[in-house]
C-alpha cells in the first residue's frame, strides 16, 4: 500500500492549528459567523489571497469541519469556461433543502478565471444564499468584477522559522530524527511554501539513508542528464529513482522529454512500455497545472511519476544502455529561433513604417512575397528596415538570401559614399561662410571704434566748455 502523502496526513484539522495566520483566521471566522447568525455580510464572497503553501485551502476545510459545512470545490484552472463553473456556483443560489448541512462553494485558483465568464459569476455571487470562498496566489489577477464583490483576506508568507517548526512537529509524530542543517536547507528551498517543504522532507526521509546528510551531499554533486537517466532506467527501486532530479540543471518538463525519448529503447515488452508512458502522461498533467497556476509545488508529484513511476513500470534491458537526446528539443529550439527572427522583423516594420503590430504582421506577408519575387526591391527593403542576414534568409529563403544580401551591401556602400560626399560639400560651404563673415566683422569693429572715438571727443569738448564757463564766472566774481 503506497504511503500517504504527509501533506494530507498532517494537514491541520482545526483553524487554531494553522501556522502564523491569526489575523487572517480571525477575519474568516467573523465573516462565516455573520452567515450563521442569519445576517449575511454585504460582500457574499470571501477572497483568500497569498503565496502558495500559506494555508488558504487548509483554512477552507478546517472552517467547514468546525462549522459543519459541506464544501463544493472547483478549480478555476480546470473549469475555466463560464458554462462549467456556473453549474457549481449555481448551488449558491439555493439552500440544501434535503440535507441539514449548508454548503460552502470553494473556488480555488480564482486568479485563473477567464475574463469572459467573470461578469456572470459576479451576478451569481450577488444573489448567493450560501457563502462563496475563493483562493488566489495573485490578488490583482482576479477579474475586477469578482474582486469588487469579495472581501479580501490576506495571507502572509511563512518565515523560515515557521516552516522549520512545522517540520519538527511532523518528525516527532513520525518518530524520525533529521539533522537541523537538513531542515534549514529544506526551509530555504521552500521560500515560505509549507506544502513544498513537507513534500521535500518526505522525499529526503524516504531516500532510505540512515544519515540524511548524505542526501544533502548528493544535492551538491552536479549530475549530467545521462547520469539522471541512469538512475531512472537502471534501477527498479522507486526511492532511488526519485533522486534523479536532485541538483540536475534542468527543469522537470525538459527532463520529461528525455525520459519520453528513451522509454522505447529501455523496455522490452509493450505492456511495460505502456505503463511507463502512462506514468509520464500523468507527470505531464501535473506539469501543465503547475505552469498554468504558478503552483510549482505540483512539480513534486510530476517528478515522482516521471522517475519512480517509470522505474517500476517493468523489466529494462540489461547491460550497457545508450541514451538518446529528444528530437522534440531540437524542433522546439528551431521553432523558437524562427519565432524570434519573425518577431524581430515585425518590430522593425512597426518602428520604420509607424504601424501597429497587426498591420506590421500583414505587411510582413507582402514583404515576404516581394523578397521571393523581386530581388532588387527586396535589397532596398533590407536597407530601409535594417534587416540582418538571418532576417533576409527568413523572408527570401536560403536560395535567394545571398543575392539579396549582396545587393543590399552594394546599396549601403553607395549610400555611404553619397553621405560622405554630402558631408564634404557641407564642410566646404561652412568654410566659405566663415571666410565671408570675417571681413564684415572687421568693418563692424572699425565702425564701432570710430563711433567710440567720436563719443570720447564730444565728451572732452563738453568738459572743456564747462571748464571755460567756470573760469569766466570766477573771473567775473573776482571783479
From Swiss-Prot:
Disulfide bonds: none annotated. CDD domains: AAA, HLD_clamp_RFC. ATP binds at residues 50-57. The keyword Nucleotide-binding applies. Residues 420-479 are annotated as: Disordered. Keywords: ATP-binding, DNA replication, Nucleotide-binding. GO terms for molecular function: ATP binding; ATP hydrolysis activity; DNA clamp loader activity. InterPro entries: AAA+_ATPase (IPR003593), ATPase_AAA_core (IPR003959), P-loop_NTPase (IPR027417), Rep_factor-C_lsu (IPR023935), RFC_lid (IPR047854). The keyword ATP-binding applies. Heterohexamer composed of four small subunits (RfcS) and two large subunits (RfcL). Belongs to the activator 1 small subunits family. RfcL subfamily. This is Replication factor C large subunit. It comes from Pyrococcus abyssi (strain GE5 / Orsay).
